[in-house]
Amino acid sequence: MLTAEELERKKKKDEKAREKESKKLRALEKAELKAKQVKDEENPKKSTKKSSQRDAAHEENPEDFVDPETPLGERKRLSSQMAKQYSPAAVEGAWYAWWEKAGFFTADAKSSKPAFVMVLPPPNVTGVLHIGHALTTAIQDLIIRWKRMSGFNVLWVPGMDHAGIATQTKVEKNLKDRELTRHDLGRDEFIKEVWEWKEKNGSTILTQLRRLGASLDWSRECFTMDEQRSRAVTEAFVRFYKEGLIYRDIRLVHWDCHLKTAISDAEVEHKDIKEKTLLNVPGYDKPVEFGLITSFAYPLEGGLGEVVVATTRVETMLGDTAIAIHPDDARYTNLHGKFAVHPFNGRKLPIVCDGELVDPEFGTGCVKITPAHDPNDFELGKRHNLEFINVFTDDGKINTNGGADFTGMPRFAAREAIVEALKNQGLYRGEQSKEMRLGLCQRTSDVIEPMIKPQWYVNCSTIAKEALDAATSDENKKLEFIPKQYAAEWRRWLENIRDWCISRQLWWGHRIPAWYATLEEDNLREFGAYNDHWVVARTEEEARREAAEKFPGKKFDLAQDDDVLDTWFSSGIFPLSALGWPDETDDFKAFYPTSLLETGHDILFFWVARMVMMGMKLSGDVPFSKVYLHPMIRDAQGRKMSKSLGNVIDPIDIIKGQEGTIPECGADALRFALLSYTAQSDKINLNILRVVGYRQWCNKLWNAVRFALIRLGDGYSPPLALSPETMPFSCQWILSVLNKAVAKTVESLNAFEFSDAANAVYAWWQYQFCDVFIEAIKPYFGAAGDNSPAERAHAQHALWVSLETGLRLLHPFMPFVTEELWQRLPSPENSERKASIVICDYPSAMENWTNEKVETEMETVLASVKCLRALRAELLETQKNEKLPAFALCENNVTSEIVKSHELEIRTLANLSSFEVLLKGEHSAPSGSAVETVNENLKVYLTVGRAINVEAEQEKIRNKIAELQKQKEKLQKIMSASGYEEKVPANIKEDNVTKLANILQEFDFFENESARLAAETGQFRK
């Protein structure tokens, strides 16, 4: 069996060959088309009727082999005749609807089988399938189908995420096309509009998941905004608040001025800017300059001079409340305790000493401080008790705090106006290019503005410690990461965790279950002015009761917070809510905690950590015991997929094909290709040619089954049990290597090594079943008298068992083609056949099938065949399929007996007219023959007559002799080294003596071969 490295090298070689062949075919098609056009122009009236009839006779329509009358949801009606070619569209039609309707994917909460549970990472309701979803689906469905076939009560829960920002943005865009805004509709009508959009468009991705074959339990489909999930979200919020884990505070947030909401860290993309760069920003007619740092002076109070500061966001100077210097900077000792004066509003800016923020070696050593608009300045502002002045409105305009000259200006227009104002006052000191990282909203591409806002937060310190211990504690470890290296990243995230901002200024989402009580006696009437006036409850009625208890005897007005929760909050409890929590449902009792979470490593913190933190706090247990994190997909050149690069791959385009660029590959080939890539560290460089290669491989499987069905015949009845030891050699061998493939596949699946599992299945089908076994058993189906009925029956049984087992082994990887082919196989008499391969048992290793002796002997057979094929390719320029005589030259009786006993297999696989086995000294090589060494005990000769290129053979032998000479000299040098006899162990010295003897023997042999060929050359010349 090929090693993983050898198999990967072979696949890459095959890909290159396919790429080369593809280019040749495109060039040929182009040339043929051009020639046809020329011909048509020369003979416009010439009839093509005969050629059309001839072509039609050879072409098949895939639809002819699927009964179009199969009602949706019924078992597929296969044609009696099997198509000659595999067609993904024909094969993948109808099966899924039947699987779903038959209930093969439905779990039973009352089952006595062991449970295996996963939740599908809920895709956005706005989403369409992308290649990352395809990878997730391929991996998860592989695991689910394997576990289902392995006797587990499998539950795979599908769900959709309401995707607050993405969905609201999508619906607002639709409203804009109708010249409306959400404010024109009002909150209730807008929410109604979103629900209508969701019902109409929201299930696209779920339909596409079916196209990929995802065997989800659709009877348990859920949506993060449905009634049950919404109740769970409210319950989680209330419990966290009552335990002091949720609080309200005024802090800096990532603010999207276009959406007018705070966004999460996960929704911020960072763009590295090397120099002055123009970028388009939503809401601006012309591009905005970034990558510049502007220097300007602040005059010092009392005419003491000035201090020069620099910033990439000069518009924020309107909110500056201090200048910071390093306490040890001797240049500014005289400024300790002094003030600068703001040039536009006269505000006194204290000069504060701060060794934590200020680097005296950077720039002038003076730093402008805007506590309300910069994270570092915010912390410094708290340390020095500075004033926090917000100068932006929610939509990114300058507010009244910025001064009358700039009020109402968009922030980047104000940037230009402020520079002009500084120039007019003689305070502008210039600008230069500056490398910077710019935060952009991934949804809108708006430039993120740090803004100080009152928001709701989760205190993560204690729950993060529990989540960290669950994965790293030696005593209480409950959580395992695969691959293991992500445990270190888990530690890094959770040891440095910050409190989580969970409120969003949107309308679509879970409205925060918090009500503000405005008391009749309150001096400040602004909503939210008093932090202790909030009550958190499950319903408004409950909130009124709590407010009455909190403010006894006082009159109050109650109003619910307009904000909604961060989408990650509802996603964070999805393993709980998907199973019915907070109710003790049958599903929750049977299936929680889940068994495994599979997702991309890019959301380890944003989703996985939050699920573990929230799940442990709310249920007392981890929501899953294992986390498998898959790689991120890149293009063939290793580049991140993006619309700007034009390298985004739509998996549906691969499945259906795209005219002129991608051939129709089908879901099976795409799934298998993605699974075969999973060994590539943390990134997958996807080459479409590999998918194309697996689509071609599906055709090979198809033809293998066609061959088998012909050989089995209509009346064949498979056996209920097998006795391999009574079977012919090739049959014993295929069962033995199949057994090993089964063991390797199961071992790899258990270890989450999906690429190795795919390679094990592929290698058996491709290199052992198709390339060897099918060819080796052809003599048993030859003319009557060439074989015994018993041998023919054994070959049929081994063929059927190999196919049936191999299809079950492959099914979780390629569900559609395996179902189609398995349904065509005959079944044993007097046995109850399962309705579908979906619910069959997954293969397990059979103790009596493994035969090491047979496998070792087959290695000799295949090595001999490989050498004979190499000689054929080397010696024959034409008639390469001509049957030729050959013989084996054996060094000893043991080798001779092995080769003699397998003469039929060698003759068949090497396409020989005869094959003679001789002991050394019993032969004289015939003229026109060439030799190849199989191993130290065996050489094979192929006789091609005078067609042999003697000079080429001589050159090959000279190279072989030169190589042997190098080996001899190297070994002799080792054996003659000082201290060799005294220091080298006896067994190694003995091995070296044997190696040297073999080298000398080979040396003599090829010297004699060279002499023989020289004599032949002379004979031919005569």
Give residue ranges: language-model regions:
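N-terminal, positively charged nucleic-acid-binding surface of large information/translation enzymes
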Residues: 2-328, 356, 370-402, 411, ...
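Glycine- and acidic
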Residues: 77-82, 121-129, 187-191, 216-223, ...
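Catalytic cores of large soluble enzymes that bind and process phosphate-bearing ligands
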Residues: 83, 87, 91, 131-135, ...
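Active-site-adjacent bridging/hinge elements
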Residues: 112-120, 142, 175-181, 206-213, ...
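Structured ligand/cofactor/substrate-binding pocket environments in proteins
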Residues: 132-144, 160-161, 229-232, 249-250, ...
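Short helix-capping/linker segments at secondary-structure and domain boundaries
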Residues: 243-246, 579-585, 615-623, 680-682, ...
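Short acidic-hydrophobic surface loop/beta-edge motif
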Residues: 294-301, 338-343, 439-443, 515, ...
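Feature 926 captures the class I aminoacyl-tRNA synthetase adenylation module centered on the KMSKS loop
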Residues: 295, 496-569, 573, 617-667, ...
